[in-house]
Design a protein with these regions (language model features):
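Active-site nucleophile-adjacent alpha helix/oxyanion-hole segment immediately C-terminal to the catalytic cysteine
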Residues: 1-41
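Conserved active-site-adjacent core of cysteine acyl-enzyme catalytic domains
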Residues: 20-21, 32-142
């Protein structure tokens, strides 16, 4: 994933990646996503993303259902096996898209700020426990 230029745009980067990776919007850009999220109501340079439901709303503009859910490690792994999702930890204050699982069963992520708080392209169980308060915004597969 291309690195974020501004510190407050990780949620837009993750949403942009999800839209392009799933084919919902192959021509998406981060700037377009910032506008779709709602600048400055839902996202701005002072607070970043103010409400994860704004991501859910953007995804649902593409005629798919999305859900926001507080998740534990096992649920995150389950979602990563079955659908496209974005993760955020309230103690990490950073959003990433999930590519899937690694060969050893960790979360393989698309991270616009690699090594922020020592997390690169993988979230391990140790990272998960170290950065509590995880939520997922994901596409609901009917």
């Amino acid at each position: 994933m291309e690195r974020q230029v501004r510190g407050w745009t990780c949620s837009a980067a993750a949403t942009d990646w999800l839209l392009r990776a799933t084919g919902l919007d192959p021509y998406s850009t981060r700037e377009k996503v910032v506008a779709e999220l709602g600048y400055p109501g839902c996202i701005d340079e002072y607070s970043g993303l103010k409400d994860s439901r704004c991501i859910q709303r953007v995804i649902e503009q593409y005629d798919v259902r999305a859900r926001q859910e507080w998740v534990g490690w096992e649920r995150a792994l389950q979602l990563a096996r079955s659908t496209a999702l974005i993760l955020n930890s309230t103690s990490w204050y950073h959003f990433v898209a999930v590519r899937g699982l690694t060969e050893i069963g960790d979360l393989w992520i698309a991270n616009s700020a690699p090594l922020y708080q020592a997390v690169g392209e993988v979230i391990t169980r140790r990272d998960w426990d170290r950065l509590p308060g995880w939520q997922a915004i994901y596409i609901v597969n009917d």
